[in-house]
Amino acid sequence: MFDQLEFYPAVNYEDNETQNDIKLPEVAKLENIETVHSISKERRDSLTEILNDSSSLPARPFSLPNPNNSTVEKQSLFPFEEKMNPIWIISRPTFSIEQDAEKKINELQTFTNIIDQILGQTNNIESTLLSMKEKFESSEKKLSEFSEMCENLSTDEMRFSEIADGIRKGLTIFAPLKELTRVFRHPPPDFAGKVSFKEHITQLNTCIMFLEENLDFQESPHYLGQYKKLLSQAMDIFKPYFIRIIKQTTDQVLKDSKKMDVHKQLHSSLFYARFSAVGHNLCPTITELCKLCSKESLDAFLPAFYDVYFQCRTRLLKPVLDYHLKSFFMEKSISSYIQKSLALLQLTFFDENKLFREILIMDDFRFMHYWNNLCQSFFENSRSLILHEKNLTELCEVCSYIQSFQNAILEGEREDVDKKVVEFLNPLVLELQERLLFVVQTAIETDIQRYSPTEEDLNPIADDKSLLFDLEKLRLNNDEEKLDPDVPQKLAMAQGWYPVVQKSLIILSKIYRLVNSQVFDEIALELVHSCIRSLVDAYRYFSRNNDKQLARLFLIKNFLVLKDQLNSFDIHYACIEAGVDLRKVWDSVREWRSNLRGVLQLVYETFPKFITNAVDTRQELNQQLRVAVNGYIETAVIHYTECLSIGNLESITEFQNRIQKFPELRQQISLYLSETWIIELFLQAIREEVVSKFQNFYESIVANEDITGSDHNKSGTTSLKHLNEYVEDIYSVMS
């Protein structure tokens, strides 16, 4: 009989349990150690009870497990059943189960002991960690206290460092007073020209700035007053040095200029190179001196510098400029003089402005005053030429050139030049405009208001190939375009315009945009009004000695030309005429003379009234043109229809003979009017009026009951045709 134990493979339970149990301490956490211990104890008690109960059970015969039983497969009680033949399996005795149970109990006991050891070690570790945590928190608290202490120490260190720096800076502010006082009270020779002088000035400014910002110091007011006194002494030391250097430089330049031709002096760097080098040394010192000076100190300090500098520069430049300006003046041409003089003065101004900024602090008012004194001869020569100039074209050219010169400076890109520099030419522009207006007024009185018409003016010879004078085509609205002043007059003469109209438009074209817009409007209104009155006078003159129709065509033509050309100008035609109304005064005087009771009324009404009337020159021009056109049309219609007498059929023949000469009327109109659409308007108006007159005549003939068509046919007179036939004949002849 085989031993039953030999059929069980040796299984190392300790190894399996050890392998399964080693991981328990890793899984269990410190906070759940007591729970794990209680659970293991309960399991151990339950296993003991199960073993005790199994020993009392009756022994069962051994049976081979069913291989298909799922429970056996799950429990894996016989892992070797697949390899062994079932016939070799013999039923196991009951005592082997007890041995296995005891063995299991021993293993569980061993496991329990191991768990107890692990739990004990875990408790020790937990207590160790808790103590370490407390020590760490204590260390962290001490560390934060230490960090806060370090920060306080760092703050105190920075504060003490600032105090130390302030003390050190205060020592540098208060300590130099004695040394600076000694230097400025007893300065060495040429002290202002040395580098140390500028360094001392910089140190003074630093001390003054610090004390002004820290007036709460105990002795700040005292030291501040002492330093400002030293700054005033520094100014007194620098002033004679500046004057001496400027005068020495001026004398050297004058000495060198005598060796050079006067024509080349301004074109060389003689007047600017040495002064620029001097300014390179003087300007920084002047800037430091003026940095913290009060306004009162500057007003007492800088004017002496400006006066000396401008006197020396005037001494250098004025003789040379006067020489060149005099040579320009000898040409006796105002346009040439202005152009050459401004070109020279522009270059000189830019150089002087640049040099002044390099030496002194820029003062626009003082510099412009100096510049006006330097240009005094230019203004005197210009006034002389302007007062003697009578040519309107020359004056307009000069005025236009000066305005272009000013605009070029205002629109220039030079930032170092003040745009107000153009103001020094404003007095010259005003004088030019005043002279321009005087010449224009003289031209209006002489050439327009006093013009006497001649027979040649009624029938001028016009060039058919000439173009219509159009101010817009001549680009008068473009400032950059310069026109030939003779072009408008030549074109006007080629078109056969009345000389008064020619001169009026030429004057307007010359002064357009050269004077104030309000002044131009006044001149334009006066010109238009004078031109209209002159044309009406010329019409009356031509009507006395010539055909009135030709005189009307002359008037219409020039009115149309004047109206068309005025559209090229921006003119406000409406103006206000002011006057005094004395009518009630004279009425009261007459009533007072006739009735003594009118004395009281005279007292109330002897004050004249100030009245204003609005005058529209364009409306006046349109009204005169309308009168002339209507007069011409009415006269032409009367010429064709005056032969029609009521009740006389023979007058129709005379009427037909007259309208046969209608092409002569077209030719007459074409002599004065060149535009086809205007001619057709005239002819259409005349044609319609003639037809209307003839219709009225025809209706009067038909309404006359004494006249019949049969009676006239019997008497051999002309028979009366239908009205439409007559109208068609009139249109066919007058078309």
UniProtKB/Swiss-Prot annotation:
Swiss-Prot/TrEMBL keywords: Golgi apparatus, Membrane, Protein transport, Transport
InterPro entries: COG3_C (IPR048685), COG3_N (IPR048320), COG_su3 (IPR007265)
Compartment list: Golgi apparatus membrane
Gene Ontology CC entries for this record: cell division site; cis-Golgi network; cytoplasm; Golgi membrane; Golgi transport complex
Annotated GO biological process: Golgi organization; intra-Golgi vesicle-mediated transport; intracellular protein transport
Subunit relationships: Component of the conserved oligomeric Golgi (COG or Sec34/Sec35) complex which consists of eight different proteins cog1-cog8.
Name this polypeptide is given: Conserved oligomeric Golgi complex subunit 3
Native source species: Schizosaccharomyces pombe (strain 972 / ATCC 24843) (Fission yeast)
